[in-house]
């Protein structure tokens, strides 16, 4: 919980750190958490939409469609072919019987709450000694965005336009701020000065 009048935001993870965490969680038999962090980072969805995913959505086709809870807009997601194997491995390891079952349910068979996931993330951060200051459910979406921008290289402006549309942001500047790029750009101004 944040202090009143304080500004706390989630941070993104470096892509390789995220992949390493997903693998470690899987190795430690934390299949649902491994899949949750993978889905969040590969799909760029809000946690409310991730929690609505079913196994059939992830396994039956290379694409699936959701109606975003926050915006009510239709969004088509393509499942990365490299990530599909991890999804299938988690499905098998969990021994899921019903493909229509939600992917992210607790041992009590109830869908996790965002608050519960954030508590689990806090424990994960500590247990796996993650080098991320503010690790929350939003970190996955930011990890996705950062990776897309970094992978675009010289075409990063075009990537920001695409992300702005994917994230349903009003404009590219909102996406820049959201990913923390604007703050970095402003801080670089101080490095332009010489002494």
Regions found by a protein language model. Name each.
Residues 1-19, 72-81, 100:
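DNA breakage-rejoining catalytic core of tyrosine-based enzymes
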Residues 52-83:
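Conserved tyrosine-mediated DNA breakage-rejoining catalytic core shared by Y-recombinases
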Residues 49-50, 145, 153-168:
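Active-site-proximal segment of tyrosine recombinases
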Residues 2, 13-43, 154-155:
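Basic, Lys/Arg- and aromatic-enriched nucleic-acid-binding interface segment
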């Amino acid at each position: 919980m944040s202090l009143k009048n304080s500004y706390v935001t989630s941070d993104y993870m470096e892509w390789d750190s995220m992949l390493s965490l997903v693998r470690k969680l899987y190795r430690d038999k934390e299949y649902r958490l491994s899949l949750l962090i993978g889905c969040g980072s590969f799909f760029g969805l809000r946690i409310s939409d991730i929690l609505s995913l079913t196994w059939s959505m992830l396994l039956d086709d290379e694409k699936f469609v959701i109606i975003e809870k926050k915006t009510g807009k239709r969004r088509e997601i393509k499942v990365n072919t490299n990530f599909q194997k991890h999804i299938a491995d988690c499905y098998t390891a969990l021994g899921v019987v019903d493909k229509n079952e939600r992917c992210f349910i607790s041992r009590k068979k109830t869908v996790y709450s965002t608050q519960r996931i954030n508590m689990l993330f806090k424990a994960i951060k500590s247990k796996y000694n993650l080098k991320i200051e503010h690790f929350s459910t939003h970190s996955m979406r930011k990890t996705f965005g950062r990776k897309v921008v970094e992978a675009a290289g010289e075409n990063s402006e075009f990537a920001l336009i695409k992300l702005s549309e994917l994230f349903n942001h009003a404009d590219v500047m909102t996406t820049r701020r959201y990913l923390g790029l604007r703050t970095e750009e402003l801080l670089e101004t101080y490095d332009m000065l010489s002494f």
